[in-house]
Regions:
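GIY-YIG nuclease catalytic motif and its immediate N-terminal context
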Residues: 1-39, 44-68, 85-87, 92-97
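Short arginine-rich
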Residues: 68-82
Length: 97
């Protein structure tokens, strides 16, 4: 049986741009949905499609807790998290497929 993973991810409209934090059990599919604008809401209206950060979890409960905490963070903390792992704000989506 294949191990199930869950992901907390951050999408950006560009370097230093608008940010979106989400959680999913299928990172490739979910980011693709955002990129293709099949997801209604904030990411669609603000052209947020660049995957700049993600974390993997083994259980959904911990992933949801992390997502909720990150959503409450100050913007500067989110930017530091991104830049510590991805200083150029590269789109990480291509590395997943």
């Amino acid at each position: 049986m294949r191990d199930k993973h869950f992901y907390v991810y951050i999408l950006a409209s560009g370097i230093g741009g608008a940010l979106y934090i989400g959680v999913t059990n299928d990172l490739v599919r979910r980011v693709w949905e955002h990129r293709e604008k099949t997801v209604e809401g904030f990411t669609r209206t603000h052209d947020i499609h660049r995957l700049v950060y993600f974390e993997q979890f083994d259980d959904i409960e911990n992933a949801i807790v992390r997502e909720k905490r990150m959503k409450k963070w100050e913007r500067a903390w989110k930017i530091k998290l991104i830049e510590d792992k991805n200083p150029n704000w590269d789109d990480l989506f291509e590395s997943l497929i």
